[in-house]
Structure formats: structure tokens, C-alpha cells
Amino acid sequence: MAKLLSFSDDSRSALERGVNSLADAVRVTIGPRGRNVVLEKKFGAPDIVNDGVTIAKEIELDDPFENLGAKLIQQVASKTKDKAGDGTTTATVLAQAMVHEGLRNVAAGASPIELRRGMEKAVAQLVEELAQLSQSVGGNAIHQVATVSSGGDQEVGRMVSEAMDKVSADGVITVEESKSLATELEVTEGMAFDRGYSSPYFVTDADRQICEFENALLLLTDRKISSVSDLVPILESLQKSGSPLVIIAEEVEGEALATLVVNKNRGVLQVAAVRAPSFGDRRKAALADIAVLTGGTVISEDRAMTLEKVSQDDLGQVRRITISKDNTTIVAKDENRDAVNARVASIKRELDETDSEYDREKLNERIAKLAGGVAVIKVGAPTETELKNRKLRIEDALNATRAAVEEGIVAGGGTTLLHLSKGLSKLAEQLNDDQRTGVEIVQRALSAPARQIAINAGENGDVVISEIQRLNKGFNAISSTYEDLLEAGILDATKVVRLALQDAVSIASMMVTTELVIADKPEPPAPAGDGGGDPMGGMGGMGGMGGMGGMGGMGGMGGMGMPGMM
């Protein structure tokens, strides 16, 4: 494919236009008075959302160079979301401000490399100062962080706080759609482990990049599955019943994995494969724990069991299973509660008998996973559109509270970054001209989140920034007053602020040092009359699709024992 090249100021200007297009769409959502954005969907009703990363992922621009700028800012939002779970809009607003200031200085003749060095020195100092300002989570802080992260929704804050009280901050908390209008909290049997799907082709929810099944069956084995013939009997049985199947094994690979992916993508089976947690004997113990939780049987080499003879009676049953790239969460059915309690008692006896600190740690982890249960927040709303938006807010609140437990809390509302900007003046004085400018680029950008929160609340952003600095307080966008935001309970997780800042500087400093942009040349649209005189004539060629019947040759897979499946 031919490429388009853009050099120097032209390339940077195009990137900045793309950055601005995306950031301007996202920034309107920041703060408790942030606006909503309506997203058209290919199928069904449009979504109304208030979530930065969801909006960012939807944006695609016509100009290939501008689109690359937008994609770079999408990367900021996605990286912040992946690592902190929240703060995507803050990261986007910071990155936009830094890109604008940085490119303006490059156009004026500043050295891009020295600017970048100055920006990196500034962020290093800010991260240190953030850690010193951070306070540990205590009292009502979990409720307050969750409320702020959900856009000031007190009910969400209460629900997340209650869920963490019931299963601890390290416990498993999931969010699902309720059958009623009310949002409710339920604690049930379940567990989570740090293994994800064996192939991204198992994803059932492209927006969240997860595979999720209701009322699924689990095939548990400590074997490696390479041959599809091992799975044919149970897969044919499940094809008739229509039940989803998740295979948790040492490894699913080669022909077996390819067959599962093909059948899933053709809609023949609802299926996914997950690598079993842990290693060696601990893997066998973990599989046994999952078997007790779900009422299944581990198909084990130690017991001379074979996969070909597996029946549906050997499979575990779950109410819901959610599989991401790195984690799996099982929400079990309640009928196995007695077996789970007996299993926990057995592990506790094992714990009493061991002297090894390492063994004790691992046994305690198993007890916590089995006994801790899963808190399920069931989200209700009058319409499907509102339900999706509310679900996104609750997930953001959960991620923010987990981040707060990890690294502590600081004053919210963009206030902490604004107050930290003063300390950069001393650093700037110690550096050469262009590095000093790099520090000042970051310094000026730190006011952007607080300014945008004020604008979204209907205030003059510059006036609010001036008052925050004069009073040495924060701006409460809900009441439009100036106060100590820590005391008012308007808090941000330190980890979220830190990662938003680091990710913004990372992308902005790279864009400042960009000299050439290479993009794919758009292909011209095919001529309308290509099919002869009759515009529908070209459709006749579709008959050639009959050749796709040759794909039935995949029925050659039938030679592997799966004729009906393929």
C-alpha cells in the first residue's frame, strides 16, 4: 500500500488537530457537572455515556495524519484505564495541554530533545511530591472516592463502600445487570484467579474486551489439550443442549484451540479456554478448589481419567463467568455452600500442620479465595442506555477505590496538581533554557483539569484557577464554593493522579520530538458502474460465493471426529 508522508511543522500541526478533536470530545465529561456524549451504534439504540475512554475509542477521523494524533491520545486513555482503571479524562486533558504548549515552543525554535528532558524531570519531581502528599485510606474515604469517581453519585459510593466492607478491599467485586430497576448488592459464592482467555477470539464483549457467559459449564483438567479428538464427545453433547462451556486446563493449544475458535466464531458453540492457575501441585489444588466451588470433577492424570469419557455430570456449573485478558472471575451457584465450607475447614487443618511460611501464605490465599465470596453489584435503570452508563460509572468507582487502597488519596478536583505546580518553579531555575521551558510546559498544563472542571460547572475557568491559588483551597464544583477538598470528602486516588500525569507526559513528550508522520494513503472508492451497464449486474458475481461451499472442505476437520460441528 502506498504511503503519505508529512514532515516538520506540517506533521506536528496535523497531529495536534487530531489530538484536539478527540480531547475536545472527551473533556466535556470531566467533573461532577460533566456533560454526556451520545454515541451512535451500528445496531440498536445509541449509547449516552460519561466515560472518557469509551468516547475516545469511538473516534475515527477522515484525515489520516489527524487520525494518528487522535490514536496517540486514545493510547493515553487506554493505558491509564488499564493500569489505574480511572483517570482517563484527566490524562487526556493533561496530554492535550502539554501537546499544545510543547508544539508551540518547537515552532518557536526550541530544541525538542531538551524540551522532552525538561518535561521528564518535571514529572519525576511531581511523582515524588505526590507520594509525600498522599494519605492512607481510612474512615469514610472509600465511600468518598467512589462517589467522586462516579460523578458525585452518592448511591454508587455507598454501594461500592458496602461491597468492600463485605468482601474486603482485596475481595472479588463484580458488576452485572439487574432484572429490576433497583441497584442492589448481593454476596455469593465465587472466586477469581489471575489467568485469562487462551485466545482473544473468545471475546464476547468487544467494548470491554471480555468473554462472559451466564449459566456456563466448566471442564476442569490438569492435562494439556492439543488434539481435538479429546473434546469431540463433550462438545457434540453440549452443541445439542446449547450450554456455554469454559475449559480450564494446563494448556489448550494447536488443533484443539483452533477448532474451538472456529466453532465459537461460527456460532456453533459458546465456548472459551482458560489456562489453569498456579503451577505443579498448587495447580492441582487450585483446580480441586474450583471443582468444589462449582460441583465439578477434575479430569486428572493421577486418577487415570480421560477426556474422551467425560460426561456432563463431570462438569462444574456457574451462575456467571467473566474472563478478561489476564483474569477470570467465577460467580458460583449457592447449592455447593456446604462442600465449600468443608473444603475451607480441610485447608485450615492443613494450615495448622505446616511450618513453612511460604506454604502458610499460599494456603491462606486459597482460604481467602474460597471463603471470601464474590460481591455482585446488580445495576438497575429504567432504560438500557442509562443502565450501560450507570454500569460504566460503577466500574470506574470500583477501580478508583482499589487504586486508593493501593497508594492512598489526595485532594480531588484537579486541586492537587494545581498546587504542586508551584514547586516546579525552583526546578526550572536550575536548568538550561529549553529544559526550563520543558518544565514550564508541564507546569502550565497542570491547571488544565481544574480549569475544565470549572468550565463544565458553568464557571469562568481562569477566574476559578486564580481563586484556588489565592485562597490555597480547592473548588467544589457541586456547590460552586472554595473549601478544603480533603475535609469536604472530594478525593482522588493517588495512583490515578500519578498514572494520568505520567501517561500524559509520556505521549506529549514523544509528540514534541516527532519530525515525520507516515500514514496509509486512502484507497479511492471503487467506480459505481463497475458491474457493467446494470448497477445490480455486479451482484451476479456474488454467485461465485458458492465457491465458499468449498469451505465445507473444512469438513475435512470431520476426519478429526467433528463432522456435525463444522
UniProtKB/Swiss-Prot annotation:
The keyword Chaperone applies. It catalyses: ATP + H2O + a folded polypeptide = ADP + phosphate + an unfolded polypeptide. GO terms for cellular component: cytoplasm. ATP binds at residues 29-32, 86-90, 413, 492. Keywords: ATP-binding, Chaperone, Cytoplasm, Isomerase, Nucleotide-binding. CDD domains: GroEL. It comes from the Bacteria. The keyword tRNA-binding does not apply. One of its GO terms (molecular function) is ATP-dependent protein folding chaperone. Its EC number is 5.6.1.7. Residues 520-540 are annotated as: Disordered. Forms a cylinder of 14 subunits composed of two heptameric rings stacked back-to-back. Interacts with the co-chaperonin GroES. Belongs to the chaperonin (HSP60) family. NCBIfam families: GroEL, PRK00013.1, PRK12849.1, PRK12850.1, PRK12851.1. Together with its co-chaperonin GroES, plays an essential role in assisting protein folding. The GroEL-GroES system forms a nano-cage that allows encapsulation of the non-native substrate proteins and provides a physical environment optimized to promote and accelerate protein folding. This is Chaperonin GroEL 1. It comes from Prochlorococcus marinus (strain MIT 9313).
